[in-house]
Swiss-Prot record:
Enzyme Commission number(s) from the entry: 2.1.1.182
Superkingdom of origin: Bacteria
Keywords (A to Z) from UniProt: Cytoplasm, Methyltransferase, RNA-binding, rRNA processing, S-adenosyl-L-methionine, Transferase
InterPro entries: KsgA/Erm, rRNA_Ade_diMease-like_C, rRNA_Ade_Mease_Trfase_CS, rRNA_Ade_methylase_Trfase_N, rRNA_adenine_dimethylase, SAM-dependent_MTases_sf
Name of the protein described by the UniProt record: Ribosomal RNA small subunit methyltransferase A
Length: 266
């Protein structure tokens, strides 16, 4: 009998083969792709990923039991998968350079999904596509439009770096143990105009400032952090100084991050 899912690792194992096949299909795997699966567990997704015929397959597994199982007893037809015992939150995603076409997939634990997507989508320069199953509520935040209740820092960040695509909803009964909420599958295609390393740091800072006080006006939020008149800075960008953070588009946040950084050192 396989071990029980570990609550400490946020494990909910997918048991529906049709759903697993649909998730793997969202990655659009080709024969030249190098694929990373996060948290393969018993291998529900792994089978379908391998069947798609990628050039290389890497399994990132934090659970010692499942890492050992994949090494000692690889799934039928998957002997060349490379198993890496690691925490995906600590993985050096910046090493996924453009020398290879990288694609990343996973049924992400609810408790670490947001920081994982934040890092992967912004730090992996060679990323071609990603497909993740996450909590439905988090998925709704990611694709939320400016001005909506769900729109926040995660929405802006991921929309600056990728084009998120809502794929489909996954009900609780296809997992063991059964979660209390619905899941959703989203796919991510990197933008060609995504922020560079310097812009990323500035964007992260301004998002942190703004969404920690999302109900305040932007001029009030930024006043302690700019070298001059916050209202004038915002007006110069075509932004209403009385606007609140959730009304700005991702593109406006990139511009605001640059302006705030320049103002602070002027």
């Amino acid at each position: 009998m396989p071990p029980r899912a570990k609550k400490s690792l946020g494990q909910n194992f997918l048991k529906d083969r049709n759903i697993a096949a649909r998730i793997a299909a969202q990655l659009h795997i080709g024969p030249d792709d190098w694929v990373i699966e996060i948290g393969p567990g018993p291998g529900a997704l792994t089978r379908h990923i391998h069947a798609a015929g990628p050039a290389r397959l890497f399994l990132l597994e934090k659970d010692h039991h499942w890492a050992r199982e994949h090494r000692l007893h690889p799934l039928a037809g998957t002997p060349e998968a490379q198993v890496v015992l690691t925490d995906a939150l600590l993985f050096p995603w910046e090493r996924l350079d453009a020398a290879h076409p990288w694609k990343v997939i996973g049924n992400l634990p609810y408790n670490v999904a947001s920081p994982l997507m934040w890092d992967i989508c912004s730090r992996a320069p060679g990323l071609l596509r990603a497909s993740f199953m996450i909590q439905k509520e988090v998925g709704e935040r990611i694709v939320a439009a400016p001005g909506s209740r769900q729109y926040g820092a995660l929405s802006v960040w991921l929309q600056c770096f990728t084009k998120p695509e809502w794929c489909f909803v996954v009900p609780p009964h296809v997992f063991t143990p059964r979660p209390k909420v619905d899941s959703a599958v989203l796919a991510f295609t990197p933008r060609t105009d995504r922020p560079d390393a310097v812009q990323s740091k500035r964007l992260a800072r301004v998002l942190r400032l703004c969404f920690q006080q999302r109900r305040k006006q932007l001029q009030g939020i930024l006043r302690p952090h700019v070298g001059g008149d916050a209202s004038a800075l915002l007006a110069g960008l075509g932004i209403d100084p009385a606007a609140r953070p959730e009304t700005l588009s991702p593109e406006r946040f990139i511009a605001l991050g640059e302006a705030v950084a320049m103002s602070a050192i002027a």
